[in-house]
Design a protein with these regions (language model features):
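Helix-to-loop junctions at the C-terminal end of transmembrane segments
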Residues: 1-11, 98
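C-terminal transmembrane helical hairpin of 12-TM major facilitator-type secondary transporters
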Residues: 8-55
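Transmembrane alpha-helical cores of Major Facilitator Superfamily
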Residues: 15, 46, 77-85
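Multi-pass alpha-helical transporter architecture, strongest
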Residues: 24-28, 109-129
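Intracellular juxtamembrane helix-capping segments at the cytosolic ends
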Residues: 54-67
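Loop-to-transmembrane helix entry/capping segments in MFS-fold secondary transporters
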Residues: 69-79
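A gly/Pro-rich, aromatic-decorated transmembrane alpha-helix motif that marks the paired
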Residues: 85-97
Length: 129
């Protein structure tokens, strides 16, 4: 699917990440037997791993299709570096928010961030020819 529209893959992955975060947050309100076991959270984590692979595929495919042959390696290297720096920054902020808000509300905040990412991806121009 990324060969047809990497922009749509990015959008759909953002929506799926938001759904996973909201599902994980909702587990806190399940009856004790469900929220006391690790399995519902393990399922959400497994789904998030799949969604993360979609985000990575969509991002790299979008960059490769957008860049010309002579700039492709530069764009991918820059994208990887910026992504790594953003992960460090957002990871630090997420840790602080997790201490302040608690896990459930942190997942809600992350869901809104994923929705914002999906909206941003939906506004990207198509680059596939």
């Amino acid at each position: 699917r990324a060969d047809r529209s990497s922009r749509q893959v990015l959008r759909d992955a953002g929506l799926a990440a938001a759904a996973c975060c909201l599902l994980g947050a909702a587990f806190a309100w399940l009856p004790g037997a469900w929220s006391a076991t690790v399995w519902p959270y393990a399922l959400v984590y497994a789904l998030l791993v799949i969604v993360h692979a979609g985000v990575r595929l969509g991002r790299k495919t979008y960059l490769v299709d957008m860049a010309g042959q002579d700039r492709r390696a530069l764009y991918v290297a820059l994208s990887n570096s910026v992504t790594g720096a953003m992960l460090l920054l957002v990871g630090s902020v997420t840790g602080v928010l997790g201490q302040w808000l608690g896990t459930t509300w942190l997942l809600v905040v992350l869901a809104f961030m994923a929705l914002a990412a999906a909206a941003s991806a939906a506004r990207l121009p198509e680059v596939e020819s």
